[in-house]
């Protein structure tokens, strides 16, 4: 209903209710494994349409290799790459040097060799933000002691 109301100029953009679906440890749901292919297909469909419904997806995982295991079939690798290509913002944090080649293959032409080379050297709070292949920004998030206490440093 919001989409139609917005198109009829009955709803202002600022008044639209937005949503985000957050998938932490997303590799448990989305990967190039054959068993995950239907989920990848469904997520891609949702991502293609979510903006018109004022929605979005966040996929988080620590290791890019978890999305594309070594024994993956090429057709499933292509599906995962297509899914990633539909995301507007990609935050790439430190990865092991063994993941650099995989990152280069997934984000081909979007990360320079020097940016790929920096990824294993990124420190705590540092990331490269890849904006839909248009621009890359290296940045660092600094947290206060209170924020660190709030998050507890993980398990």
Locations of regions flagged by a protein language model:
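Conserved P-loop NTPase motor module
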Residues: 117-155
């Amino acid at each position: 209903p919001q989409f139609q109301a917005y198109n009829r100029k009955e709803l202002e953009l600022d008044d639209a209710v937005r949503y985000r679906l957050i998938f932490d440890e997303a590799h448990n749901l989305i990967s190039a494994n054959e068993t995950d292919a239907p989920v990848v297909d469904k997520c891609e469909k949702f991502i293609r349409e979510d903006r018109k419904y004022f929605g979005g997806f966040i996929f988080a995982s620590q290791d890019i290799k978890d999305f594309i295991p070594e024994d993956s079939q090429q057709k499933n690798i292509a599906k995962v790459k297509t899914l990633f290509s539909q995301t507007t913002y990609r935050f790439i944090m430190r990865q092991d040097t063994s993941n650099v080649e995989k990152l280069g293959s997934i984000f081909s032409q979007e990360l320079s060799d020097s940016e790929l080379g920096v990824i294993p050297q990124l420190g705590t709070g540092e990331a490269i933000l890849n904006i839909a292949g248009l621009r890359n920004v290296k940045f660092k998030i600094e947290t206060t002691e209170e924020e660190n206490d709030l998050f507890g440093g993980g398990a």
